[in-house]
Regions:
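Glycine-rich, proline-tolerant flexible connector loops at the mouths of alpha/beta enzymes
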Residues: 1-17
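Short beta-strand segments at enzyme active-site cores
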Residues: 1-2, 33-38, 138-140, 172
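Short secondary-structure capping/turn micro-motifs that flank functional sites
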Residues: 4-5, 42-44, 62-63, 86-87, ...
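Catalytic beta/alpha-barrel core
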Residues: 13-15, 30-40, 52-65, 76-87, ...
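Aromatic/hydrophobic pocket-lining residues that form the small-molecule binding cavity
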Residues: 16-23, 63, 90, 161
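Active-site loop-to-helix "anion-binding N-cap" substructures in soluble metabolic enzymes
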Residues: 22-25, 44, 64-72
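Conserved structured catalytic cores and adjacent interaction surfaces
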Residues: 47
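Catalytic alpha/beta core domains of metabolic enzymes, predominantly
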Residues: 71-172
């Protein structure tokens, strides 16, 4: 899949087939596992050709058809918690994946909306999501985003990465 940026001049990516060609080459040459976003059930079918992990983006984490399609791939599914969602609500997303018979699930904490142009990490969410029985990942860089800036481009606080990563490690 491709990531659409806020500012229309940022572009929308290479296209699915070209992107998968590049990911396949990276996978083969560097012997890496590949994780890629999917944005529609149809993209799940395409991504499974190369991806070891299909990732459901935060803004789409409640989309039943997408979650079920991701689960049906049989691959690991990483569900990024929406900035608008409580950690407890992620249980419903995992149940949709589990309904397909796929138990290969990971959850990602990536921050919670704090006002209009900021995100914060509520570290209590990590142990809460761990109670579902799946690994929880902390996406430090996304949690430090400052979306919807007046420039039309997402900003952030890269100088805080080290501190948030250490805090995430402390929480587990």
């Amino acid at each position: 899949g491709f990531q659409t940026e806020t500012l229309y001049l940022s572009g929308t990516g290479l296209g699915d087939e070209k992107a998968l060609e590049i990911l396949s080459k990276v996978k083969q040459e560097l012997k890496l596992h590949i994780c890629t976003d999917i944005h529609s059930p149809e993209e799940a079918e395409i991504a499974v050709k190369v991806a070891d992990i299909v990732q459901v983006p935060a803004f789409l984490c409640r989309q039943t058809d997408l979650l079920i399609a991701a689960g049906k791939t049989g691959k690991f599914v990483n569900i990024k918690k929406g900035q608008f969602l409580s950690p407890e609500s992620m249980k419903f997303a995992t149940e949709k994946i589990l309904s397909t018979g796929n138990k290969n699930i990971m959850l990602t904490e990536r921050g919670t909306t704090f006002g209009y142009n900021d995100l914060v990490i509520d570290f209590r969410g990590i142990p809460k999501m761990k109670t579902f029985g799946f690994p929880v990942v902390l996406d430090v860089t996304h949690s430090l985003q400052q979306p919807n800036q007046s420039s039309g481009v997402t900003g952030g606080q890269p100088e805080m990465i080290e501190y948030m990563a250490k805090a995430g490690l402390a929480v587990g």
